[in-house]
Amino acid sequence: MERQYILNAIDAALCAGKDIISIYDDPASDFEIEKKADNSPLTIADRKAHETIAKILQDTPFPLLSEEGKHLPFVERHKWETLWIVDPLDGTKEFIKRNGEFTVNIALVHNSVPVMGVIYLPVKRELYFADEEIGAYKLSGITTRAEATLDELMASAVRLPDKVGHDKFVIVASRSHLSPETEVYIEEMKRYHSDVELISSGSSIKICLVAEGKADVYPRFAPTMEWDTAAGHAIARAAGMEVYQAGKEEPLRYNKEDLLNPWFIVEPRHVKTKKRSL
């Protein structure tokens, strides 16, 4: 893929992050919370971030599949060899709680595989970006690209994974969706590891923690959609990790007829499959 596309995605994520923070930091804002058809929350920040991302990415040759955009039927989408998959504000519940654990997720998917990913944490001003050719990186303290080239961004960033190997076996799990099946998995891991630590986090940050090497595994045995995982999946792949369907050797696939993900586990590629069992 052309390098310009990842710069497009970075610009879109940073600009959307600026929109989100302008609302998040406004003490008078009540976030104008609505309920979507699946009863999940929707705020004005979700809508504004979507509009910003769509405007920037419209200059690329690829169609856009966004959580907050119009979802075309599969009879149309299946023709898309390459597409953007976007969650303008991943972790709306965390945004509403004002705990800072929300992200902007932008992925480029080619033939059902996420080949490029950008995740931005507006509160922490942390940017994760990756593609198959350059690898995965984390850049801290960024709010705008300011005409920096991709090489300049990479030179200022940390190559992932940054932290490999620690005394404890670290599991990262959802702060808002810790299912009974996940709790069973955690107990099972205690049979294989003498010292297990559980980290709770929101949004796609969990995948990033595995990509960084700060966590060993992220089990997700609860519903997610393709836009929740595509960007993180691209970053994980570029960092030597994989997002496997739970209980299988197969990674998640994208632009499916049903946009709901199966349960999955994020872990290094070399890990034995027994850890993917439920």
Can you name each region flagged by the protein language model?
Residues 80-119:
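Glycine-rich active-site/cofactor-binding loop and its immediate structural neighborhood
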Residues 20, 46, 57, 92, ...:
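Residue-level signal for inorganic ion chemistry
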Residues 47, 69, 176-177, 204, ...:
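Short, surface-exposed acidic/glycine-rich loop or hinge patches that mediate macromolecular interfaces
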Residues 107-207, 256-278:
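Acidic beta-strand-loop-alpha-helix segment within the catalytic core
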Residues 76-78, 96-100, 130, 257:
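Short glycine/proline-enriched turns and hinge-like loops at secondary-structure junctions
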Residues 1-13, 17, 183-192, 199, ...:
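Oxyanion/phosphate-interacting regions
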Residues 1-89, 184, 242, 248-250, ...:
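N-terminal subdomain of lithium-sensitive/metallo-dependent phosphomonoesterases centered on the IMPase/IPPase/PAP
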